Amino acid sequence: NLYQFKNMIQCTVPNRSWWHFADYGCFCGYGGSGTPVDELDRCCQTHDNCYSEAEKLSGCKPYIKTYSYDCSQGKLTCSGNDDKCAAFVCNCDRVAAICFAGAPYIDDNYNVDLNERCQ
């Protein structure tokens, strides 16, 4: 779920608050359209698409689905998720959090004008 995703981000990117990712580019945060502005925004587009795939699983609601995972020294592991939805959503969030850690953060792409840059 989104709370766990926030915690995963704090695991892989401990030196930057999770809310820096909540309104970044065209895809990080609510909704998403246009072309990603950079590598970090592409991480978010991929995460959005992953959630869309998760929603195709019967009764799977990725924004609120809880799952089990471990964070150890910046390494994330999804664990003990017997149900398909939990395992899928955990992996969506894990892959995105790792992607965030590897992508440059460009301050100019925070809080962009969606109408101007995301058509």
Swiss-Prot record:
Expressed by the venom gland. SUPFAM superfamilies: Phospholipase A2, PLA2. InterPro entries: PLipase_A2 (IPR001211), PLipase_A2_Asp_AS (IPR033112), PLipase_A2_dom (IPR016090), PLipase_A2_dom_sf (IPR036444), PLipase_A2_His_AS (IPR033113). Its main location: secreted. Its cofactor is Ca(2+). The active site is at H47, D93. Disulfide bonds join C11-C71, C26-C118, C28-C44, C43-C99, C50-C92, C60-C85, C78-C90. GO terms for cellular component: extracellular region. Gene3D superfamilies: Phospholipase A2 domain (1.20.90.10). Its EC number is 3.1.1.4. Keywords: Calcium, Disulfide bond, Hydrolase, Lipid degradation, Lipid metabolism, Metal-binding, Secreted. GO terms for molecular function: calcium ion binding; calcium-dependent phospholipase A2 activity; phospholipid binding; signaling receptor binding. Binds 1 Ca(2+) ion. Ca(2+) binds at F27, G29, G31, D48. CDD domains: PLA2c (cd00125). It catalyses: a 1,2-diacyl-sn-glycero-3-phosphocholine + H2O = a 1-acyl-sn-glycero-3-phosphocholine + a fatty acid + H(+). GO terms for biological process: arachidonate secretion; fatty acid biosynthetic process; lipid catabolic process; phospholipid metabolic process; positive regulation of fibroblast proliferation. Coiled coil: none annotated. It is found in: Secreted. PLA2 catalyzes the calcium-dependent hydrolysis of the 2-acyl groups in 3-sn-phosphoglycerides. Belongs to the phospholipase A2 family. Group I subfamily. D49 sub-subfamily. PANTHER family: PHOSPHOLIPASE A2, PHOSPHOLIPASE A2 FAMILY MEMBER. This is Acidic phospholipase A2 CM-II. It comes from Aspidelaps scutatus (Shield-nose snake).
